[in-house]
Design a protein with these regions (language model features):
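Sequence signature of WD/YWTD-type beta-propeller architectures
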Residues: 21-303
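Bacterial N-terminal signal peptides
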Residues: 7-17
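Positively charged n-region of N-terminal signal peptides that target proteins for export
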Residues: 1-7
Length: 303
């Protein structure tokens, strides 16, 4: 969620390839800017040609689309609501997102040209963090845990059938957020709170059973994202004090630091070819202030 307004959003290329035990002190590579506004939560399309992202317009978080080179921007939403957590359908024909207005948060879908917006999740739920199943028939999402004490209580993970609107509870008990299904549809990665001072990346079977802790670290960690081939998971965590982006194997082994950033780096997203990770980096701890959209090429990583 991004509730503030910032003035500058940039893409920064970082050439990194380091293990957690040998993190560099300065990012490598030359930084350059493509956009100059509030731009966060960028998600590349399945074909890698377009990027959906969020920009603040007159105090509202609106959805935008641009080409992967930063050109050809179009505004998708223009209503008096906030729009968060965009996610492409596997065929690139729909974009899901959170539509927040008048105290409600529902999962909605829209065409990439900005037409055909439809709310699909129940208004009785405060829905967040939608992601599509590989077959494009369902959307996973969670309920609002508010992320701020003492409001942490229950956040369940659901699947909704896009055609029938039927909702199935997959994971319950505690605070479970950021669900995303593996490319082969066999597993769900998600973030689970462990008390008030720790969160971990978990993985469960596709029906929500057999949850197991992958990160097992005393830090706050979450925001999981599967690599296109399903062999690795990117995530964000503050195990090095500041929130940074890491990559691990799908079994939780071989954790590597992707980008040595300052501030709060979260919401990693893989490029369709698996060679880059996009993420949002906020220079302040609270979301939405001085946030940059960044991309880290992984050519030199030990895969």
């Amino acid at each position: 969620m991004y509730r503030g307004i910032v003035k500058v959003g940039v893409f920064v290329v970082l050439l990194t390839s380091v293990r957690e035990t040998a993190a560099q002190t300065e990012p490598l590579g030359l930084a350059y800017q493509l956009t100059y506004s509030f731009n966060v939560d960028n998600v590349p399309s399945p074909d890698g040609e377009r990027i959906v992202f969020i920009r603040a317009i007159e105090g509202r978080a609106q959805l935008f689309l641009m080409n992967s080179d930063g050109r050809g921007e179009i505004q998708l939403t223009r209503d008096a609501a906030d729009h968060w957590d965009p996610a492409w359908s596997p065929d690139g024909q729909k974009i899901s997102f959170v539509h927040a207005k008048d105290g409600t948060k529902v999962i909605a879908i829209i065409n990439p040209d900005g037409t055909g917006m439809e709310e699909i999740s129940p208004k009785t739920q405060r829905a967040l963090h939608p992601s599509w199943t590989p077959d494009g028939k369902r959307i996973l999402y969670c309920t609002d845990d508010d992320l701020r004490p003492p409001a942490k209580n229950e956040a369940e993970i659901y699947a909704i059938d896009v055609a029938t609107k039927h909702v199935t509870t997959l994971i319950s008990g505690g605070v479970n957020t950021f669900p995303v299904m593996s490319p082969d549809g066999s597993r769900i990665a998600f973030r689970r709170m462990i008390g008030e001072m720790n969160s971990e990346v978990f993985v469960a079977d596709a029906d929500g059973s057999n949850p197991r802790n992958l990160t097992n670290h005393p830090a706050f960690e979450g925001w999981p994202a599967w690599s296109p081939d399903g062999t690795r998971i990117a995530f964000a965590g503050n195990r090095n004090s500041a929130y940074q982006i890491f990559v691990m194997r799908a079994d939780g082994s071989d954790v590597q630091l992707v980008a040595n950033t300052e501030g709060r780096a979260t919401t990693p997203r893989w490029s369709p070819d698996g060679n880059k990770i996009y993420f949002t980096n906020c220079k302040h701890v609270d979301f939405g202030r001085s946030c940059d959209v960044m991309v880290a090429p992984l050519e030199g990583e030990n895969r």
